[in-house]
Swiss-Prot record:
Domain of life of the native organism: Bacteria
InterPro entries hit by this protein: Alkyl-DHAP_Synthase, FAD-bd_oxidored_4_C, FAD-bd_PCMH, FAD-bd_PCMH-like_sf, FAD-bd_PCMH_sub1, FAD-bd_PCMH_sub2, FAD-linked_Oxase-like_C, Oxid_FAD_bind_N
EC number annotated for this UniProt entry: 1.-.-.-
Domain FAD-binding PCMH-type, residue spans: 47-226
Keyword Flavoprotein assigned: yes
Listed SUPFAM superfamilies: FAD-binding/transporter-associated domain-like (SSF56176), FAD-linked oxidases, C-terminal domain (SSF55103)
Higher taxonomy: Bacteria, Pseudomonadati, Pseudomonadota, Gammaproteobacteria, Enterobacterales
UniProtKB keywords: FAD, Flavoprotein, Oxidoreductase
Any matching Pfam family: FAD-oxidase_C
Gene Ontology BP terms: lactate catabolic process; lipid biosynthetic process
Protein name: Uncharacterized FAD-linked oxidoreductase YgcU
Length: 484
C-alpha cells in the first residue's frame, strides 16, 4: 500500500529533520519544473504534479537513508542541484514525488595540486570551484554558459560540456572518480586513478545518468594550469556553412586544438555579432595554454583559414569582447524573464551532433523542414544555428530558434511551439545518422526518441535500469520513457 502525501512528509522529517523538509507551496511549484517550462513559469502557471516535498540533503549518509526509505515505498525521487537544466529532466511527472536537493552539500573537499585533481561535493557551484582554483593558478577547463548557476553533481549527471571543450574535453573526459548512492541506498565509490583496464569503465554508468540510475554525491575532476594572459583570439566572416564545416574539420584533422572553435550561420551570427557579421557566417577561435602551444595553434588556424579566400579576418578585440560576456548568471536569467513577459518572444536551443559527412546535411534538412512544415513558421522571429564543439570525426550543431507566442495560453506554448520544433530536429538528425542530443541530456522531452537513438544498444540501457533501479523510483520519465 502506497503512503499518503502526509505520511511521506512525516517520515522524511524523521529521517533528516523537519528543517530539511520543505513543503511551502511556492517552493514546491518551482521545484516541479526546470527551464524547459520557463514560459508558463514566468506566468505563474504550473500544470505538473506538485512534489510532496523538497528535501535539503546535507550528507551522503542522508541521501542513503532517504533513498532507502523511498525505494522501500516506491516513491519517485528527482535529484536536483543547481537547477540550470533545460530539457525537462527536473520535472516531477509522478504524483507525490520527492525532490532530492543536494545544493547544501557544498564543500570543496580537496584541491590536490600534485595529482592535478579537485574533489567536491555535488552541491558545489562550478563557479565557486573554478574561482578557488584560479586563486591558485589552476582551472577545471569546464566552462558551460551555465557556470554561474550549475553545480557539480548536475553537471556530471547530465554529461555536460563547456565552451572550451575542443581543448579540455567534456565532463566525461574530466571526471576521475565519483561517489554515488544507488536507489536502494547503497553507497558506491569509484576510486581516483589516471586509467585502468579492470573491466568496463564503470564511471560511465554514473556520468550522464540524469538521476535515473543513482544520486551523485561527490566528484573528482582533473585540473589544468590557468594562463589567460596567453589567450589568442581569431574571428572571420564567410559566405556559407559548408565552407565553415570544412575549415573546422581541417583544423581538427591537422591536430590543432583551440579551446574555442565556433561556426555561426548568418541568422545566429547576426544576433551575436551585429557590429561586424554583416549578414554573413562567422568563425571564431581561441588558442590558449602554454604560450608556445597557443602561438603554434593560432598560427596553424590562421594558415588553414587563409586557404579559403572568402574568409575575411575581423579585429580580434571584437572577439575578446564577445568572449568576456558569454555566461548566463542570475542577472541575465532575471532580465530574460522580464523581456519574455513584456514581449511574448521566446528563445530556445536544441543541440545535436554528427560526423563530418552528415553534419551539413543535418543543418540544411532541419532548417528547411522547419521553414516548410512547421505550421506556425510565421511566428518564428529567428531560426539559425552554430557549431561550438568539434572532434576528430565530427562536430555538434546548436539549432537556435526564437518565436512569438501567439493565440495560446501560457501552458499551451510547449505543445504548440517547442515540442514540435524539437521533434523535427530530433527526427532529421537521427534519420541522417547523427545523435539527437549532444550535451543537454535527454530529459523528459526528447525521451520519445531514446529507443530510436540507441537502436539495438537500447538493451544495454534497459539492463542498467533493471539492475540499479528495479523499483523505478529514480527520476521517472527521464532517459527511459514511461511505458503506458
Amino acid at each position: 500500500m502506497s503512503l499518503s502525501r502526509a505520511a511521506i512528509v512525516d517520515q522524511l522529517k524523521e529521517i533528516v529533520g523537519a528543517d530539511r523538509v520543505i513543503t511551502d507551496e511556492t517552493v514546491l511549484k518551482k521545484n516541479s519544473i526546470d527551464r524547459f517550462r520557463k514560459f508558463p513559469d514566468i506566468h505563474g502557471i504550473y500544470t505538473l504534479p506538485i512534489p510532496a516535498a523538497v528535501v535539503k540533503l546535507g550528507s551522503t549518509e542522508q541521501v542513503s537513508r532517504v533513498l532507502n526509505f523511498m525505494n522501500a515505498h516506491k516513491i519517485n525521487g528527482v535529484p536536483r542541484t543547481g537547477a540550470s537544466a533545460t530539457e525537462g529532466g527536473l520535472e516531477t511527472v509522478v504524483e507525490n514525488s520527492v525532490v532530492l536537493d543536494g545544493s547544501a552539500m557544498n564543500q570543496i573537499i580537496n584541491i590536490d595540486i600534485e595529482n592535478m585533481q579537485a574533489t567536491a561535493q555535488c552541491g558545489v557551484p562550478l563557479e565557486v570551484l573554478e574561482n578557488a582554483l584560479r586563486e591558485k593558478g589552476y582551472t577545471t577547463g569546464h566552462s558551460p554558459q551555465s557556470k554561474p548557476l550549475a553545480q557539480m553533481g548536475g553537471l556530471v549527471a547530465t554529461r555536460s560540456i563547456g565552451q572550451f571543450s575542443t581543448l579540455y574535453g567534456a565532463i566525461e573526459d574530466m571526471v576521475v572518480g565519483l561517489e554515488a548512492v544507488l536507489a536502494d541506498g547503497t553507497v558506491t565509490r569509484i576510486k581516483n586513478v589516471p586509467r585502468r583496464a579492470a573491466g568496463p569503465d564503470i564511471r560511465h554508468i554514473i556520468i550522464g545518468n540524469e538521476g535515473a540510475l543513482c544520486y551523485i554525491t561527490e566528484v573528482t575532476v582533473k585540473i589544468f594550469k590557468f594562463t589567460p594572459e596567453n589567450n589568442l583570439f581569431y574571428g572571420y566572416i564567410l559566405e556559407d556553412m559548408k565552407t565553415g564545416f570544412n575549415i573546422l574539420r581541417e583544423i581538427m584533422v591537422e591536430g590543432y586544438r583551440p579551446s574555442i572553435a565556433r561556426l555561426y550561420d548568418a541568422e545566429d551570427g547576426t544576433q551575436h555579432f551585429t557590429h561586424f557579421a554583416d549578414g554573413k557566417c562567422v568563425l571564431i577561435f581561441m588558442a590558449e595554454g602554454n604560450p608556445r602551444i597557443a602561438k603554434v595553434t593560432g598560427e596553424g588556424i590562421a594558415e588553414i583559414v587563409a586557404r579559403y579566400p572568402q574568409c575575411q579576418r575581423v579585429d580580434s578585440k571584437l572577439i575578446e569582447t564577445w568572449f568576456n560576456n558569454l555566461n548566463w548568471g542570475p542577472d541575465k536569467v532575471a532580465a530574460e524573464r522580464v523581456q519574455i513577459l513584456k514581449t511574448g518572444n521566446m528563445g530556445f536551443t536544441t543541440e545535436v551532433s554528427g560526423c563530418w559527412s552528415c553534419i551539413h546535411e543535418i543543418y540544411e534538412s532541419v532548417i528547411n523542414r522547419i521553414r516548410t512544415e512547421f505550421p506556425h513558421a510565421d511566428d518564428i522571429t529567428m531560426l539559425g544555428g552554430h557549431s561550438s564543439h568539434s572532434y576528430q570525426n565530427g562536430t555538434n550543431m546548436y539549432f537556435v530558434y526564437d518565436y512569438n507566442v501567439v493565440d495560446c495560453k501560457p501552458e499551451e506554448e510547449i505543445d504548440k511551439y517547442h515540442n514540435p520544433l524539437n521533434k523535427i530536429i530530433c527526427e532529421e538528425t537521427i534519420r541522417l545518422g547523427g545523435s539527437m542530443v549532444h550535451h543537454h541530456g535527454i530529459g523528459k522531452h526528447r525521451v520519445h526518441w531514446s529507443k530510436l537513438e540507441h537502436g539495438s544498444a537500447w538493451a544495454l540501457l534497459e539492463g542498467l535500469k533493471k539492475q540499479f533501479d528495479p523499483n523505478g523510483i529514480m527520476n521517472t520519465g527521464t532517459i527511459y520513457p514511461i511505458e503506458k
